[in-house]
Design a protein with these regions (language model features):
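Start-of-helix register in tetratricopeptide repeats
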Residues: 7, 224, 498, 532, ...
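Conserved structural position within tetratricopeptide repeats
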Residues: 34, 522-525, 555-559, 589-593, ...
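Alpha-solenoid helical-repeat scaffolds
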Residues: 366-561
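Terminal, low-structured helical/coil segments at or just beyond the last alpha-helical repeat
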Residues: 698-730
Length: 730
């Protein structure tokens, strides 16, 4: 079987298991396993089949078994686990993916390369490093770093490729969490390996280990574990229902609600990462080109050197030029995005992932470390001068780990003179701030915040799935819908009003009306709705063009918060969209009472009156709009049309002539032609109709648009029999 056939057959078996068609699933799995030489798996399946056959026989005999449902769940779970391992076993034989090459090479690893043995090597690193520092010229440092990094690499790869931990593996992995000597970076890397392994294949022992890791004292570790849990559940959304002990542990973790709040934060960070492509596009197409266009303006400005140097007074010309260029708004927008945790550096660093360091998958997950051999090679063991400044910058929480490595490698490849010049662009005030102990301490504290750590880790993952050489070998969760609150195991944890509202509002702010609406509806069903929620639900429905439902939501908002101008205005709009012009007019008049000179309100109130054929009243609104807004062409168009259908032809032509002298559209020539024809100016009418046909792009569209006005023309006294003749004049 090829890869596609294996995946399809596996998915078919899983679909049967999800539908609880266990007997069929076992039969299909038996056929699936005939293609594999894995006898232990065949034995496991045979045992599961035998147990199920006995269970069915007892049921047929009417034997009451209070443990029947529990046993059924266990057999179904075992069948699913066998299917998982069978899939991997078959793929190992045909797939060229890195993961399967690792699995095929696992047998070559010496047996002493277990977790506990590797742990001892890693634990010895801090002491060995301290000894190296005492030696002249850090003698032996290169060999020590190489041994440490290779050991961490073996632990990462062997953990990732091990799809089914034994009890011994689980106990040894717990030993890593309990160790006080293991370097935190190594534990972080191991946590990522556990997550990657779970993405490939569900393993209860690994998931249980992540639940332990969430309570680890180190923030780097517990935040990685939290993200790992989110990823595991996104990859296997229904799987936890088969393991009551795991769902019970999740509930226990959330006893005080803190786990749910943290997981909800991860949820938002994952959703926010899905906005990265939009931000990247904005950076490439708007902000960077705008900055390039304004380089000369900013460079040629007077920088006020004649001012008293003692005065900290900025030249107002700078701000004016900055704001008038439009760059100010764009940079403020990007600053706001950065402050909320958006990934604003992806476009900058995407091109800097071609260094040899990034060819190895595990390096994408290694926390940034100035003592990593690749960094020491470029900057030395104890950075000084410019490198010390760079080191301070890298301690901040502004860049994710992957980007910090990219920045270092890029700086290392820049000649020293240019590097010095770049860093010299920082003012002495900036440098003093960095060197100032209290301020650098504040930067470190910011970098150590749980939300900053988890957000930067999500950015690391985003880069791995989008930029790594082997990205096509992985399922990219960032391309899929992320809806953690819908996962059954998280229902009691995340489906709480105070958490759902944050997700709903995120989708609302990012203009995802369908996703926001689903959550607002859920909040309404939980009886947690206020006027604000009904307003937002209405707005989402309006964006989805579900106007009648939007009206229902807005009316409820109006009951809870009466006469709110925003609600009234949107009610008017929705009624107008469903062509209930009488109701729309009623609400426009309410808005008018609050905002008597709102241009849009005047125009749409007049439009509703025109649709209701109350032309005299409509004209009063359009005249008022024309009075308060100079050269208002849309008011002229409305006056022209209302005057025409109301028999005021001279007034109609007066306004159409004003339009034709300004910025006419095809419809303006058409309507002016109607007026000219009705006033007996046949030649002028034909001329105007010809211009309309030209503007419409041909006779076909012109005749279609003309046909829509035919009834109105006849009502105004144009003979229906003359219409074909006029068409031939055009």
């Amino acid at each position: 079987m090829n890869e596609q056939a294996i995946q399809e057959q596996y998915q078919h078996i899983v679909a049967l298991l999800k539908q609880q068609r266990l007997k069929e699933a076992q039969s299909q799995l038996e056929a699936f396993l005939w293609n594999s030489g894995d006898w232990p798996l065949r034995n496991r399946l045979e045992q599961a089949q035998t147990s199920y056959q006995y269970m069915l026989q007892y049921m047929r005999q009417g034997i009451d078994d209070p443990e029947r449902q529990k046993l059924y769940r266990q057999i179904l779970t075992e069948t699913w686990e066998v299917a998982d391992q069978a899939r991997l076993s078959l793929l190992d034989g045909v797939s060229t993916h890195y993961y399967h090459s690792l699995r095929n090479n696992r047998e070559r690893l010496p047996k002493e390369y277990n977790i506990a043995a590797l742990q001892k090597v890693l634990e010895s690193f801090p002491d060995d490093l301290a000894v190296c520092q005492l030696m002249p010229d850090n003698q032996g440092l290169d060999a020590l770093l190489q041994r440490h990094e290779q050991t961490a690499q073996v632990l990462f790869l062997s953990t990732w490729s091990n799809s089914d931990w034994s009890t011994e593996d689980e106990q040894q992995a717990k030993g890593l969490l309990e160790s006080e000597m293991l370097p935190v970076n190594d534990l972080c890397l191991f946590t990522s390996a556990v997550m990657l392994s779970l993405m490939e294949c569900f393993d209860t022992r690994k998931f249980s280990w992540l639940l332990d890791a969430v309570t680890h004292a180190n923030t780097q570790v517990n935040q990685r574990a939290l993200v790992g849990i989110a990823f595991a559940l996104l990859f296997h959304p229904t799987r936890l229902s088969l393991y009551p002990e795991l769902t019970a542990r999740l509930s226990l973790l959330n006893e005080d609600g803190s786990f749910g709040k943290q997981l909800n934060r991860i949820y938002i960070e994952l959703l926010r990462s899905q906005e990265t492509e939009k931000i990247d596009k904005k950076m490439r197409e708007e902000i960077i080109p705008e900055m390039m266009r304004n380089v000369n303006i900013m460079r040629n400005m007077k920088f006020g050197f004649e001012e008293n140097p003692e005065e900290n007074d900025l030249n107002p010309d700078w701000e004016k030029a900055f704001e008038s260029s439009g760059l100010g708004d764009k940079i403020r927008e990007m600053n706001e995005l950065q402050l909320e945790g958006a990934d604003v550096y992806m476009s900058t660093f995407a091109q800097l992932k071609t260094y040899p360091f990034f060819k190895e998958p595990y390096n994408w997950f290694y926390p940034f470390d100035m003592h990593h051999s690749s960094i020491i090679k470029e900057f030395g063991f104890k950075p000084t001068g410019d490198n010390a400044i760079l080191s301070l910058i890298l301690q901040s929480g502004f860049f994710c780990n992957s980007d910090k490595y990219s920045l270092c490698f890029t700086m290392a490849h820049i000649p020293q003179s240019q590097r010095t010049m770049m860093l010299s662009q920082m003012t002495s005030q900036d440098l003093d701030a960095l060197m100032d102990e209290s301020k650098s301490s504040a930067l470190r504290q910011y970098a150590e915040r749980p939300d900053v750590i988890s957000n930067q880790y999500v950015h690391d993952l985003y880069r791995f799935f989008k930029l790594s050489q082997r990205r096509h070998e992985f399922r990219d969760i960032f391309k899929e819908e992320i809806a953690l609150h819908r996962i059954p195991a998280l229902k009691d944890i995340l489906c709480k009003p105070e958490l759902l509202i944050t997700i709903a509002d995120f989708h609302f702010r990012k203009e995802h009306p369908a996703e926001a609406l689903e959550l607002y509806k859920e909040l309404i069903a939980l009886n947690h709705a206020n006027a604000d929620i009904f307003q937002k639900a209405g707005y989402c429905l309006q964006k989805e063009k579900r106007y009648k439902e939007a009206i229902d939501a807005y009316l409820k908002a109006d009951v809870l918060k009466p006469d709110h101008v925003w609600t009234i205005r949107h009610l008017a709009t929705c009624y107008r969209q469903i062509r209930d012009f009488a109701s729309a007019l009623e609400y426009y008049k309410k808005v008018e009472a609050i905002q008597p000179e709102s241009h849009n309100v005047l125009f749409y109130a007049g439009s509703c009156l025109a649709e209701l054929e109350r032309y005299e009243e409509a004209l009063q609104y359009f005249f008022k709009l024309d009075f308060i807004e100079s050269n208002c062409i849309k008011a002229w168009r409305a006056i022209g049309w209302c005057s025409f259908v109301n028999g005021k032809y001279e007034q109609a032509m007066k306004y159409y002539e004003k339009i034709l002298a300004s910025k006419p559209l095809a419809a303006d020539y058409l309507n002016a032609g109607h007026v000219a024809w009705r006033t007996g100016k046949i030649e002028k009418a034909a001329e105007l109709y010809s211009k309309a046909a030209l503007e419409y792009g041909g006779q076909e569209i012109f005749r279609e648009m003309f046909g829509k006005d035919k009834e109105t023309l006849v009502r105004q006294g144009i003979s229906e029999k003359d219409i074909p003749l006029m068409m031939d004049l055009v």
